[in-house]
């Protein structure tokens, strides 16, 4: 449950050496019943704490970061599949996923739906910094393109790719139906030959699926090479 309250905060004014009281609105996230807490979430919170306290300081592409390697989290998707201790843009997540599944590389399609998470990487300035002479909004052969047209030559966001490349997603769905015990149920967005053509190389690069026929369940293991854990 979320509530908003007005509280008085004392702010020090260095010019006159006095404290001033300022009324501020603060959002609180409140649990009414501890039994309702998403237990799977504790592993996420524990990992955040571990990175902050024991992570390795690294100077990366985006400046200084705290780094950790080989961490693992397991979530039961039969229960509530989202974090509850921070705001989660469910519609944004869903729209981006559907955009990936479509195989699109055109950021404008996301913008038209109110999704701007790729806009910073789709600007002409950013694309030029990557050495890419694309039209603004063209993200190159990123996730969805690799899922639906793996290996196809890239001709820009307006290109026609019908029957071009290998449709991994189509194959994966068919293979799960016809050969559920296969150990090759893999979906990959990592194509080394195309990394320099992408606005950004993929972060979640590989997913492997596992069918438990006895229980009638489908599990997914995802490998993510890099992630902004606190966003």
Model-derived features with residue positions:
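Terminal, non-catalytic protein-protein interaction segments that mediate quaternary/complex assembly
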Residues: 17-231
């Amino acid at each position: 449950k979320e509530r908003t309250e007005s509280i008085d905060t004392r702010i020090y004014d260095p010019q006159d050496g006095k404290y001033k009281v300022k009324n501020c609105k603060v959002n609180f996230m409140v649990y009414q019943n501890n039994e309702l807490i998403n237990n799977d979430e504790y592993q996420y919170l524990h990992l955040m704490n571990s990175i902050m306290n024991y992570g390795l300081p690294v100077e990366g592409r985006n400046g200084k970061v705290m780094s950790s390697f080989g961490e693992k989290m397991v979530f039961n998707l039969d229960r509530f599949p989202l974090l509850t201790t921070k705001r989660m843009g469910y519609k944004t997540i869903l729209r981006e996923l559907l955009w990936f599944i479509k195989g699109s590389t055109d950021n404008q399609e996301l913008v038209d739906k109110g999704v701007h998470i790729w806009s910073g990487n789709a600007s002409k300035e950013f694309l030029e910094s990557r050495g890419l002479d694309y039209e603004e909004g063209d993200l190159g052969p990123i996730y969805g393109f690799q899922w639906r047209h793996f290996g196809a030559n890239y001709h820009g966001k307006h290109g026609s790719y019908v029957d071009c490349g290998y449709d991994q997603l189509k194959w994966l769905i068919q293979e799960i139906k016809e050969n559920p015990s296969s150990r090759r149920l893999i979906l990959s967005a990592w194509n080394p030959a195309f990394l320099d053509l992408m606005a950004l190389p993929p972060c979640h690069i590989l997913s492997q699926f596992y069918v438990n026929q006895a229980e009638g369940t489908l599990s997914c293991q995802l490998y993510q090479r890099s992630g902004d854990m606190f966003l």
